[in-house]
């Protein structure tokens, strides 16, 4: 894997932290990383090209894995407003399960880094692969994924051309997963909360500048204060009368 990256770099291709994370995942056999890498790649491929399922089914090793049944529904999926690539899947699963948003941290955790002692420990690598695998499986859940897409469409975003920021959509799905797992949140209100957050962050371009830094802050503050408390704070700070009377008008004029 390292040799492949060296060859890619020699040709001037720019690699990001998700690429490095995928290299670590693909090279890992001990904790099932090689099969996890396939699941991530296959999901992103099927979300764009459902008919490719027949080709995927030829991979007998994968079809006998825990992931195969999680992807089967995609062969009949024709939804186009959310077709995540491997970068999106990794980012969402990471934010959801680890409470962090900086992808370089995922690379370090998969390598076993202890952020407190600055040492590398095998148990941290094992735990990190386990958490990431769990996050990816939750990401792929048909009911969860489909209901999230329906929520976004119900807010008026009915076509992919209306989605002006993929990373904003990524955070919205992360939030959907987090709220589903939060016992303190009324499950009947999750769609409502996610829609409000998505519309607010879209209108204010919250994740356009330094997205990882802002998402990292949001994730940590949601964990510390609870979603409802933090949402009220962010809403009050960003959707004041000044925003509606001046900032939004200027945005619509450009």
Where does each model-flagged region fall?
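Extended, regular secondary-structure scaffolds
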Residues: 2-79, 84, 183
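A cross-family structural signal marking well-folded subdomains
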Residues: 19-22, 59-251
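Short loop/turn segments at secondary-structure transitions that flank enzyme active sites
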Residues: 1, 10-11, 178, 200
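Histidine-centered nuclease catalytic patch
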Residues: 254
């Amino acid at each position: 894997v390292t040799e492949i990256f060296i060859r890619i770099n020699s040709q001037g291709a720019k690699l990001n932290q998700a690429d490095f994370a995928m290299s670590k995942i693909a090279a890992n056999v001990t904790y099932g990383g090689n099969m996890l890498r396939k699941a991530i790649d296959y999901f992103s491929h099927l979300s764009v090209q459902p008919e490719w399922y027949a080709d995927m089914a030829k991979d007998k090793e994968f079809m006998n894995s825990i992931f195969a049944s999680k992807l089967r529904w995609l062969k009949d999926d024709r939804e186009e407003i959310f077709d995540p690539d491997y970068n999106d899947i990794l980012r969402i699963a990471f934010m959801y399960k680890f409470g962090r948003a900086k992808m370089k941290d995922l690379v370090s955790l998969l390598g076993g880094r202890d952020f407190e002692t600055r040492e590398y420990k095998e148990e941290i690598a094992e735990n990190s692969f386990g958490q990431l695998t769990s996050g990816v499986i939750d990401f792929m859940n048909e009911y969860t994924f489909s209901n999230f897409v329906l929520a976004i469409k119900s807010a008026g975003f009915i076509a992919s051309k209306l989605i002006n920021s993929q990373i904003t959509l990524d955070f919205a799905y992360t939030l959907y997963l987090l709220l589903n797992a939060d016992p303190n949140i009324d499950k009947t209100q999750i769609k409502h909360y996610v829609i409000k957050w998505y519309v607010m962050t879209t209108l204010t371009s919250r994740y356009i500048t330094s997205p990882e830094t802002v998402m990292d802050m949001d994730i940590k503050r949601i964990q510390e204060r609870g979603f409802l408390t933090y949402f009220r704070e962010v809403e009050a700070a960003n959707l004041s009368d000044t925003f509606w009377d001046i900032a939004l008008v200027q945005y619509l004029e450009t």
